[in-house]
């Protein structure tokens, strides 16, 4: 008796995800997924490390991930954006697995130590980036949606889009940076990286500085995201997905 509802929910989620992936323009899904994978690779490099601040390479691309999530949340909803976030995280894990296998295969053709070190990665960096991304994505998506409800009189206006993207991005980026930094550089790095570590203060300042830097990028590029979502609405993008969700909610 319990297995049938569970199987039904799984089929419903599978169908919803399949329709959603067909509904969101492929360019946005591709950019989003690639940015998530790149964040994982770039996070292996510390760009700046001072007593009060530390920044890793993920800051260079993470703003794009959040901009894509904000666009999807605005047009398709927080649930849809979260589904796509999980999809991107799974692709990231599969990519990292391929990199790991490639780096683990011995080769005498040349010295691939640098390649193996970069693309082989470490399991705790993958763990930190995946956990941090999923938590921050959920909070970003649903806070974005909640803030949008405060502008019921003009939900599609520039002010509404700006406020929901700026606030949710800052919150999400701070949590993403902080959770990742604590997991990787406070807990695991001292054990596996010969004593190298960040302090909690460095993690907090990294998270704050990174959130501010990525917020600036969001401010610079949000007009593009706003125009894209306006075009999506004008061209009725995603009607199949909206029809599906309406049918499911009516059952």
Model-derived regions: residue spans:
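Alpha-helical transmembrane segments and their cytosolic interface
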Residues: 13, 157-159, 163-164, 174-181, ...
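Membrane-helix interface motif
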Residues: 100-109, 182-192
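Helix-boundary and loop/linker segments of multi-pass membrane transporters
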Residues: 21-22, 114-120, 154-159, 195-200
